[in-house]
Amino acid sequence: MSEQDFREIARNGLWRNNPGLVQLLGLCPLLGTSNSTVNALGLGLATMLVLACSNAAVSLVRGAVSEAIRLPAFVMIIAALTTCIELLMQAWTYELYQVLGIFIPLITTNCVILGRAEAFAAKNGVLRASFDGLLMGLGFALVLLVLGGLRELLGQGTLLADMHLLFGPAAADWKIQPFPQYQGFLLAILPPGAFIMLGLLIALKNRIDESLAERAKVQAGDVPATQRQRVRVTGVIE
């Protein structure tokens, strides 16, 4: 596997084909658990681990599973790995496990995981499949983390609250409160606020992509000379 392959998989997972911002998969946990940083980070890490491990497992058994039972077999693999993560969370982060509730076992039905198993892991070697799962999971976790951080900050006026649920007593004083007198904005931590914030993040990503595409056209000389000066001044092609 070449360095170019690694870079391409990383770009797809983190930005170009991000599960949360581009594919719009896994929206149920993405919107349901992103009301705080600790919830978002906990579910994001769990999903990333299941995705990386399931991709590796599917790649290993892809030649031994017939076409007729491929999807049920993949679901069983994902369910087994999700159960392992669930048991680990019960043992080490039980309070966070209770907070996340049904969203941990629901990782089994996350479309991101089954989609990567079917579209990528079943057609590639273990190394490529594992790296794809890791980067896709990381991209999903980062969207969860950004969304959770923004919603917590706007809704409660804090950041990194209750991080001891994930990292233990040492993280009890990680809480940041930039605006001590802030009364909070209830909409931000409710489901409608999650939809609004996700929509704004998607719009921001699309705008960045458009700007990068316009700059690439200018650098490649595809923009007429009469427009180049305006692009340099405003950054926009009209």
Curated annotation (Swiss-Prot):
GO biological process entries:
electron transport chain
Residue intervals passing through the bilayer: 41-61, 71-91, 95-115, 130-150, 184-204
Q: Which UniProt keywords apply?
A: Cell inner membrane, Cell membrane, Electron transport, Membrane, Translocase, Transmembrane, Transmembrane helix, Transport
GO-annotated cellular components: plasma membrane
- Alphabetical list of InterPro entries matching this protein: NqrDE/RnfAE, RnfE
Question: What EC designation does it have?
Answer: 7.-.-.-
Membrane topology annotation = Multi-pass membrane protein
Query: Where is this chain's protein located in or outside the cell?
Result: Cell inner membrane
What domain of life is recorded for the organism?
Bacteria
Which function does this protein serve?
Part of a membrane-bound complex that couples electron transfer with translocation of ions across the membrane.
Similarity field: Belongs to the NqrDE/RnfAE family.
Against HAMAP family, the record matches this protein to: RsxE_RnfE
Q: Which PANTHER family match?
A: ELECTRON TRANSPORT COMPLEX PROTEIN RNFE (PTHR30586), ION-TRANSLOCATING OXIDOREDUCTASE COMPLEX SUBUNIT E (PTHR30586:SF0)
Q: How does it assemble?
A: The complex is composed of six subunits: RnfA, RnfB, RnfC, RnfD, RnfE and RnfG.
Q: What is the protein named?
A: Ion-translocating oxidoreductase complex subunit E
Ranked from the top, the taxonomy reads: Bacteria, Pseudomonadati, Pseudomonadota, Gammaproteobacteria, Pseudomonadales
